[in-house]
């Protein structure tokens, strides 16, 4: 019986593990292609010199020592939230509630700084604020985990909705604590006394934040890869049935992991309020909870690689703002360039994991069958 159906021109085949230098070569090639595409679009749409545009992006992050430290601060905050969501992601618990957990930590820190400024010493107030932020973030992460463990609720929707609750809760307290009344904002908390503010190192208010997040990065890496708890959450992520078979209490792991994720987000909230911004607003989290999802996936849940992924995203965000200001471009155009670069970077992961296998020529196939 003749089979007249043709084999597809190509099909997708999963690769074996590529050597690290080949994988990074593909990523580097993707970045180069992305920059070329962005240059063509920039010249076509705006008429600007793409080299000047790229130079402006680089200068916005590396043009001075202060700019470098601002980049480091932005990188650290993104990295902190990425570290927070990663344990849950490894467990296949889709924690989209980083925004709300950060705001919970921010609210707790601000409450301590406002309500306890005149009653406790500065060092003790900082410690209380840190602990309160950790607890607040852990509670905010623990609520959806409890419902997931108890009634198998959808964690994606639950954690997402918790973001809106946290935002409105912060908005409520901003009105209560607003200075002056009717201003709709709190302003700088304890500006004259600086009670509850993290100390500066060498006159640099960003350095301590960066150090804390780097220490946290090492701790999370060790926790995920060399601890019993890290092993358990990986097993749960691979198969809940297998985890139960080997005696792992899945519900306990879910709650424990989300308490940890929320606590780390709470630390980020504390660093934002007590370390750098010294205020409270609904926009203080700055969308980091959602950006962290992309960073965590881009780094394949590896805390060390997240350092570079976070720096890339922070650099692109800062550069996009700079070129929209310096060249008078619509900020949406800057976001388009950022999106194109990210598209190529994320898309290249497909070619690292898979390859295209093309249909063999008819003559060659016949020769092989002889």
How should these model regions be labeled?
Residues 1-31, 39, 44, 218, ...:
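Cytosolic-side transmembrane-helix boundaries in multi-pass membrane proteins
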Residues 17-25, 89-97, 121-190, 226, ...:
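Short loop segments and helix-boundary regions at transmembrane helix junctions
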Residues 42-46, 56, 61-116, 130, ...:
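Single transmembrane alpha-helix segments in multi-pass membrane proteins
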Residues 47-52, 89-106, 149-158, 232, ...:
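Short, non-helical or kinked segments that cap or interrupt transmembrane helices
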Residues 75-86, 107, 138-142, 164, ...:
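Hydrophobic alpha-helical segments embedded in the membrane of multi-pass proteins
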Residues 155-226, 279, 333, 364-369:
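Transmembrane helix-bundle core of multi-pass membrane transporters
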Residues 202-279, 303-304:
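Helix-loop-helix "hairpin" substructures at the membrane interface of multi-pass membrane proteins
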Residues 259-265, 271-339:
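Transmembrane alpha-helical segments in multi-pass inner-membrane proteins
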């Amino acid at each position: 019986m003749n089979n007249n159906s043709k084999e597809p021109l190509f099909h997708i085949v999963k690769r074996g593990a590529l050597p690290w230098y080949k994988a990074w070569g593909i990523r580097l090639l993707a970045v180069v292609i992305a920059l070329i595409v962005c240059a063509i679009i920039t010249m076509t749409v705006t008429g600007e010199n793409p080299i000047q545009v790229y130079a402006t992006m680089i200068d916005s992050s590396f043009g001075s020592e202060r700019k470098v430290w601002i980049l480091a601060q932005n990188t650290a905050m993104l990295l902190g939230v990425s570290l927070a969501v990663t344990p849950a992601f490894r467990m296949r618990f889709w924690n989209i509630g980083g925004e709300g957990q950060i705001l919970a930590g921010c609210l707790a820190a601000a409450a301590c700084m406002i309500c306890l400024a005149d009653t406790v010493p500065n060092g003790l107030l900082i410690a209380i604020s840190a602990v309160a932020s950790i607890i607040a973030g852990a509670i905010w992460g623990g609520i959806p985990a409890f419902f997931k463990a108890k009634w198998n609720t959808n964690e994606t929707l639950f954690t997402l909705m918790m973001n809106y609750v946290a935002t409105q809760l912060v908005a409520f307290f901003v009105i209560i604590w607003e200075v002056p009344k009717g201003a709709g904002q709190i302003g700088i908390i304890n500006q004259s006394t600086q009670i509850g503010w993290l100390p500066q190192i060498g006159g640099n208010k960003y350095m301590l934040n960066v150090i804390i997040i780097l220490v946290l990065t090492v701790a999370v890496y060790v926790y995920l890869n060399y601890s019993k708890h890290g092993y358990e959450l990986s097993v749960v992520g691979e198969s809940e049935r297998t985890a139960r078979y080997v005696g792992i209490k899945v519900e306990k792991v879910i709650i424990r992991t989300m308490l940890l994720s929320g606590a780390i987000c709470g630390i980020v909230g504390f660093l934002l309020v007590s370390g750098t911004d010294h205020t409270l607003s609904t926009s203080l989290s700055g969308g980091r909870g959602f950006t962290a999802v992309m960073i965590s996936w881009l780094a394949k849940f590896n805390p060390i690689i997240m350092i570079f992924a976070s720096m890339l995203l922070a650099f692109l965000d800062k550069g996009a703002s700079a070129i929209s200001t310096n060249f008078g471009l619509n900020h949406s155009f800057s976001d388009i360039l950022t999106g194109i670069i990210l598209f190529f970077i994320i898309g290249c992961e497909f070619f690292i994991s898979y390859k295209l296998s093309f249909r063999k020529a008819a003559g060659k196939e016949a020769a092989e069958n002889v």
